[in-house]
Amino acid sequence: MRMTPPKDEDGPRVTIITPSLNQAPYLEETIRSVATQDYPNLEYWIIDGGSTDGSLDIIRRWADRFPFIRWLSERDNGQSEAINKGFRLSSGEIVAWLNSDDTYAAGAVRRAAEFLAAHPDCMLAYSDAVIVDDWGAPIEIYPHTQKIFNYRRLASVSDYIAQPSTFIRKKVLDEVGMLDEGLHWCMDWDLWIRIADKHPVLYFPSLTARLRDYAQTKTRMGGRRRWMEIVSVARKHSGQRFPPAYFIYGLESTATRLNLDRSVRSRIKRMFLFKIIKLCIDRHLDVFPDGWVTQKIEFSFYNAPARFILKGVWPLENVPVLMDVVLNGHRIRTFRFEAAGMFTVTVELPAELLAAGRNALLVRSSRLFRYSRHDRRRLSFRLIDHAFEGGAAPATGGNIP
């Protein structure tokens, strides 16, 4: 099919890939959300696995209307193979995949392309997504997204990146590889970790996608096999025999099975399990969505900046606190605060402690407090902003509002 020649002013070409198999009830809405994007240099590949439910009629109708929509239909060995096929066929500098029951928000592709243009070192950008029900009605904003990227937490605790909100520079796939076709549930999580091990991964503030959640999703139907795959990925990347993900997703799998039983006892057990899951996840949080930090917060960064700048608020008057700054396991500074209010600290980063690739900088507080009787979180300070400056300044995580 003929492709519209790109113009220099159109920005880098973005290729969207949709893998699909017998998803006719949702497919048209997915295609419409891509076809109506306001980004001019767009390529769209629909990789169909041999559908027999009318999906091909929907695809043909849209492909006839929009010359940037291309498609093929043939049997494959699952979602990962279909997406990889799309990666190989794509001509875009930026690639993403959108499953055939998810949709993009208006302007999503343009905002992602603009963000990546402003952050040339970033190889994977992610944002927010809203969870919708079977009918497309919003349920909630995806609650696990972390605005400050943390490699350790991604590799060992949970996948906090909403897949349809992600956009990838295609060239990084030549370095780290495409999706592992042996994985059926965690292929995206595994790819995020492999990219983040070598290059900056950044959050950008935007509501980019709608993530559909209903009883027949592959995630819901995965059961124990999905849990075992999660455990294998977490073990591989964290080096831990029993990483936190082992327990968090094990409890989640049990709660999902209980969901099939509508008895009062099962509902009570399910509610109890989800409370435990939330406690487990919160225990490993660095920073809450409102900017409050737990006992420690870790920043992942790359290259070799000269200094780190941290801005925050210490809330307690006449209560002294010590804050250690630890670079790649070495404590390099300790700060003491005694008065409540805003603070700004600047830390010079010793060049001899910086790694060539991924680095970790930890800020650890000596005191915790509870904000009120109604807020039982154990907190240290509120993060306002952070930055790495000087040297080969790296891309780093986004600000906290």
Descriptions of predicted regions:
Residues M1-A35:
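N-proximal low-complexity "stem/linker" segments adjacent to membrane-targeting elements
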Residues I16-I17, I141-V233:
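Conserved nucleotide-sugar donor-binding catalytic segment
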Residues P40, D48-D57, N99:
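A conserved acidic beta->alpha catalytic loop
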Residues N41-G50, R70-R75:
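Short beta-strand/loop segment that forms part of the nucleotide-sugar
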Residues G54, E81, D102-F115, D133, ...:
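Acidic donor-binding/catalytic loop of UDP-sugar-dependent glycosyltransferases
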Residues E74-S90:
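Glycine-rich, basic loop-to-helix element that forms the pyrophosphate-binding segment
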Residues V95:
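Short aromatic/hydrophobic "clamp" motif used to bind/position activated sugar donors
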Residues G107-I139:
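Conserved donor NDP-sugar-binding/catalytic core segment of glycosyltransferases
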